[in-house]
Amino acid sequence: MFGGNMRIFEVMRETKETNIYLKINIDGTGKYKIDTGIPFFDHLLASFAKHGCFDLIVKARGDLEIDDHHTVEDVGICLGLALNQIEKRNIFRFGWAIIPMDDARATVAIDLSGRSYCVGNYEPKREFVGDLATENINHFFESVASYGMLNIHYEVIGKNEHHKAEALFKAFGVALDLATKIDERKGVISTKGEVKL
């Protein structure tokens, strides 16, 4: 799961609200061990890992007796911090995906640009799916973009909130897999000669 000469990044974050451990192998095969205390969020992260072919471990303990906001936010922060460690040389840099799931369809485009920006239109019609407050899905992606220093744009349509959310996380995984592909022809893909602020 984490052997060999691979791009593996590890983040630990502990606050008064959460205790998060995250490890991701960008060059993995889609294996995962995820326990955030929020079963539907675990399912979404598993979908991201499986369809992006990332090996992912997430262990999170948060103040769920209050609500799920801090846990979802801080997992997003940790994933962003991990992704920000990716070497921005000899990779595709851009990634995109259009993923259907029955009635739902999600479109995601990302740029590992060294600049943080998130634009999304996921508009849930239900307050919860399982134990996950659907409003926190947008906040998760905002946190990933902010701490990962990447652009994330996404659009979601559909009727079923489970399908909409799952299609979105699958599309994010597929798009990120493309953006992180090694291509030694690329060098640094920027007319500035570097990918950072």
UniProtKB/Swiss-Prot annotation:
PROSITE patterns: IGP_DEHYDRATASE_1, IGP_DEHYDRATASE_2. Keywords: Amino-acid biosynthesis, Cytoplasm, Histidine biosynthesis, Lyase. It is found in: Cytoplasm. It catalyses: D-erythro-1-(imidazol-4-yl)glycerol 3-phosphate = 3-(imidazol-4-yl)-2-oxopropyl phosphate + H2O. Pathway: Amino-acid biosynthesis; L-histidine biosynthesis; L-histidine from 5-phospho-alpha-D-ribose 1-diphosphate: step 6/9. HAMAP family: HisB. This is Imidazoleglycerol-phosphate dehydratase. It comes from Methanocaldococcus jannaschii (strain ATCC 43067 / DSM 2661 / JAL-1 / JCM 10045 / NBRC 100440) (Methanococcus jannaschii).
